[in-house]
Regions:
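N-terminal membrane-targeting/anchoring modules of bacterial envelope and secretion proteins
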Residues: 1-577, 592, 740
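Short, contiguous clusters of charged residues that form electrostatic/catalytic patches at enzyme active sites
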Residues: 210, 583-586, 590
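Lipolytic serine-hydrolase domain surface
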Residues: 547-586, 627-629, 635-746
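Conserved acidic catalytic loop of the alpha/beta-hydrolase fold
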Residues: 587-599
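Gly/Ala-rich beta-loop-alpha elbow adjacent to hydrolase catalytic centers
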Residues: 604-614
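Active-site signature of alpha/beta-hydrolase-fold catalytic machinery across serine-
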Residues: 615-619
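Short helix-capping segments at alpha-helix termini
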Residues: 621-625
């Protein structure tokens, strides 16, 4: 090898140290910073059997997604926003700019912001300010609440309404603080794509900072509008004036303007391959109008009006929650129908994960998480305020308990969530049990070919390998569980939405309350169970975030989901966790461009690092790509991304990537790997490729473990490596040297 070649290693999910990535005890950073940096072995430390011209370098980006436990919990708090943002990226190929899926997804995201604000309003303004504070038994012995009882109604509501604004500002701060090291990182792009479909090779694809700012202004206006409407609606009910009506109508005009802006494309159309500039028309006026209306609404609310003492729920709040659920049900149905229509037009939809319905599944999961959080928050606060008596539509409060009445919609949503959780759990168990025999038979065939004549003492180890191979294929068997979840979510949100028309579960509970006590008690127990189960699920998500710091397996599982969700830009919900790829991809592109000025580069991506590598290469110009080769290992490019996000990383994109780099591409995979897999051809060594050349030459299977018997110079059998590590396998080094020899030194 007469020319210098740098093997640039990019790690996968859950991160790893630069020392482990380079398999070297002493490393030094040569570029980047503490968040994401490039490292090399320090010269003079350790021996290497590689040629001097073949150097190793590592890109460590794990700090972009990892952090303290407090940060992880704050990101889990943003889970619903992340899921709805992911929906638009999981759409089927459309051949256009996304069709209806983009606008519908943005509207769904706005309803989640509205639901968030309504849940905070429900706790502060409704439960505390309207229902608890005027009721002396509720504030007795609670000095932190007793002072509110001495305030007039208007000032009390205005003071408590500051908390939803603070919560909205917290969301803004979380996203803004975390994105400072991600967004607005200089991004290039080769601009070779055509057509209207947004593609990963578009210039500026990974620079959406202005899009996020635009969405953030709209969502803040939505949140403030929902708060203003809640305050003014209550004021109109107790003391109607023309000023209140004018402000109320103005707030709804503001919300309508937000809907229009969300339906419009975020970027202006342009001729050519590049992306148009962000359309910021009307955003400044929207921001000024939203702030002005909020100040006026607070000013009107704070004036003491001497109304009748409040009783029951905050006027209009129950109906507002029910109306929001109705809108969400309609939008989710439109999203599902649109996805089904576009799925029929896509290439090979049966090969897609979730049968091409990933977009509505993610949206439904976002709603489930959002209402799980909301129901747990509202009902647990109500449970605390009324001193342990759980409000129930079919069972009256105990004598002497504060008559708190949270929105019954949350209760029905929790019950629907309980039904969905139970059915999904049953479907998952059933599916795993039904496929166990087939997976075991497949594992028997694989292990039998890898180890045809094992010694008798290796039979227990052989059984372990069979079990690992069988478990590695479980993920592909869970499609029915997710589809059941989608169907039940659509049915559940539709049934809950019927409350708005007087034919929903609330009317059923009222009829049951006048009949036999058994039916009433059964309904009460079911809804109570729903509240507790959904609350436990929400708590479990938070606990999972903490456990990920103690268990490597848990951390890896959480990281797979989290790194997938935060890989894509925030083009739907601005309060989703920030997109780390908006820094990682341009940074990798810049480093590769600099290195190719001195020689060749082999970008070696493990697991999710292979996705970053592919996205980076799609942004590089042809003169740089002529000096680049790609080595992927443990890669989910086809197993997960091509099937989950076919519009952006589908098979046509992967074939185009191979052509751009002259098919200087090797992919290593194992049957024991539950995450990675083949990309083009799942053939074994000695078998003909299942795809025509040159794509059929990319995939190379590694036997794992290397043997099931104890080597003569060891005391234990070789480990079952599963998903990590790959770089310690002899086939890995052989692939690196092969690709280095195929690089053009010119």
């Amino acid at each position: 090898m007469a020319h210098e070649v740098v093997e640039l290693r990019v790690h996968g999910v859950s991160g790893t140290s630069a020392e482990a990535l380079l398999d070297h005890p002493v490393v030094t950073r040569v570029a980047g910073d503490d968040h994401a940096g490039f490292y090399r072995p320090r010269p003079g430390f350790g021996d290497s059997d590689r040629p001097a011209e073949l150097r190793a370098e590592a890109y460590r980006w794990g700090a972009l997604t990892a952090g303290s436990a407090a940060r992880t919990l704050s990101l889990l708090f943003l889970l619903p926003f992340m899921l709805v943002n992911l929906a638009v990226w999981a759409r089927p190929p459309t051949g256009g700019a996304g069709g209806l899926i983009g606008p519908v997804s943005r509207l769904l995201a706005a309803t989640l912001t509205a639901a968030f604000v309504l849940s905070i309003v429900g706790v502060t303004v409704d439960l505390v300010g309207w229902q608890c504070a005027p009721y002396r038994p509720c504030v007795r012995g609670r000095p932190y609440l007793a002072w509110l009882a001495d305030l007039p109604l208007g000032p009390r509501l205005a003071v408590l309404a500051l908390l939803p604004i603070a919560a909205l500002r917290l969301l803004w701060w979380l996203g803004e603080r975390s994105s400072r090291v991600f967004e607005a990182f200089p991004a290039g792009g080769q601009g070779r794509s055509g057509g209207a479909e947004d593609r990963l090779d578009r210039p500026g694809f990974w620079n959406d900072a202005l899009v996020v700012q635009r969405l953030r202004a709209i969502h803040v206006a939505v949140g403030l509008g929902v708060l203003d409407a809640s305050l003014l609606g209550a004021q109109i009910h107790i003391y109607s004036t023309p000023i209140a009506h004018v402000l109320f109508v103005a707030v709804w005009v503001l919300l309508a303007a937000c809907v229009v802006l969300l339906c419009l494309p975020a970027r202006r159309p342009v001729d050519g391959p590049g992306r148009g500039p962000v359309d910021l028309r009307g955003i400044r006026a929207l921001r000024v109008t939203a702030n002005t209306l909020t100040v006026l609404a607070f000013g009107y609310t704070v004036v003491p009006l001497e109304p009748q003492p409040p009783h029951g729920q905050l006027p209009g709040y129950e109906g507002g929650v029910a109306a929001l659920v109705t809108v969400q049900a309609a939008l989710l149905a439109v999203l599902a129908a649109t996805t089904l229509h576009q799925r029929r037009r896509s290439h090979n939809p049966a090969a897609s994960w979730l049968s091409g319905l990933a977009a509505p599944v993610f949206a439904a999961a976002a709603f489930a998480a959002a209402y799980g959080y909301s129901a747990a928050l509202v009902y647990r606060v109500a449970d605390f305020l009324d001193r342990g008596e759980i409000p129930n539509p079919a069972r009256p409060n105990a004598p002497g308990a504060p008559p708190l009445e949270p929105p019954v919609t949350y209760r029905w949503a929790a019950l629907a969530g309980l039904v969905a959780v139970l059915f999904v759990a049953v479907t998952t168990v059933w599916r795993i049990a039904m496929t166990r025999r087939r997976r075991r038979r497949m594992a028997e065939e694989i292990v039998g070919r890898d180890f045809p004549e094992p010694p008798p003492e290796a039979l227990p180890r052989l059984a372990d390998v069979r079990a690992v191979v069988a478990r590695a294929g479980v993920a592909e068997q869970l499609n029915p569980a997710f589809l059941v979840f989608l169907v039940l979510s659509l049915l559940g949100v539709t049934v809950v939405a019927l409350d708005l028309f007087g034919i929903g579960p609330s009317s059923l509970s009222e009829r049951l309350a006048g009949t036999s006590g058994q039916a009433t008690m059964a309904l009460a127990l079911a809804t109570d169970a729903g509240i507790y189960v959904i609350g436990l699920v929400a708590l479990g998500i938070l606990v999972l975030g903490l456990l990920s710091y103690r268990s490597e397996e848990t951390r890896r599982t959480v990281a797979v989901i989290w790194d997938l969700g935060t890989f894509w830009p925030r083009t739907v919900h601005p309060f989703a966790p920030p997109c780390y790829a908006e820094r990682a991809v341009p940074e990798l592109a810049r480093r590769i461009t600099a290195l190719t000025g001195k020689g060749g580069v082999i970008i070696s991506g493990h697991s999710h690092g292979s996705v970053l590598a592919a996205a980076t290469l799609l942004q590089l110009p042809a003169d740089v790509l002529s000096r680049v080769a790609l080595l992927t290992h443990g890669s989910p490019l086809h197993r997960l991304y091509a099937r989950l996000c076919p519009a952006f990383l589908g098979d046509p994109t992967l074939h185009e990537l191979g052509e751009r780099i002259g098919w200087r591409w090797v992919n290593l995979w194992r049957d024991t790997d539950p995450i990675g897999g083949p990309i083009f051809s799942a053939h074994r060594p000695g078998d003909p490729p299942r795809a025509p050349a040159p794509a059929g030459t990319v995939d190379r299977r590694l036997r794992d473990p290397l043997d099931v018997a104890v080597p003569p110079d060891d005391t234990v059998p070789p480990p079952i490596n599963r998903h990590w590590p790959y770089h310690t396998d002899p086939m890995y080094e052989a692939a690196v040297r092969e690709l280095a020899g195929r690089l053009d030194p010119a």
